[in-house]
Regions:
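Nucleotidyltransferase catalytic core that binds NTPs
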Residues: 1-139
């Protein structure tokens, strides 16, 4: 089973490792759609570590089999998801609509589209107590 996830993975930390470990438990291949610097800055902030540095760290993680750039042209990750052809897309529970964030709107793909493509969505619990934003704020 191919698992796909997307994110910025800035200031890589134990929470990222745990998330990717849980992705690996879902399938035998994990592909990360790594947000480009420009895309990350468009909705959050410019990453502390540039794309090349974040990509190198992810490629070194034993739970990751591949990294592809995610710049969401036209505001949607649909083409990237189709190109990766995952069986499962994994996201953290903190982006679940029930927690006040609309992950589907952020990736620019309607929830029912995934089911029509035969792609399952798996919501992985957020690792409490650690976040890149909190680490950056302490620096």
């Amino acid at each position: 089973m191919r698992v796909f996830t997307m994110g910025t993975f800035d200031v890589f930390h134990a929470g990222h490792v745990e998330f990717l470990r849980k992705c690996r438990l879902l399938g035998d291949q994990v592909i990360v759609g790594l947000n480009t610097d420009a895309f990350a800055e468009s909705y959050k902030r410019r990453p502390t570590i540039d794309y090349a540095g974040r990509e190198a760290v992810l490629r070194a993680c034993r739970y990751v089999d591949g990294v592809v750039p995610n710049d969401q042209p036209g505001g949607t990750a649909m083409a990237l998801i189709l190109a990766v052809a995952p069986d499962i897309v994994a996201a953290t529970m903190d982006y679940h609509p029930s927690n006040g964030k609309d992950w589907f709107a952020q990736v620019g793909v309607a929830e029912d589209w995934f089911a029509k493509q035969g792609i399952a969505i798996e919501w992985i619990p957020y690792t409490q107590g650690v976040s890149s934003s909190a680490i950056v704020a302490r620096l």
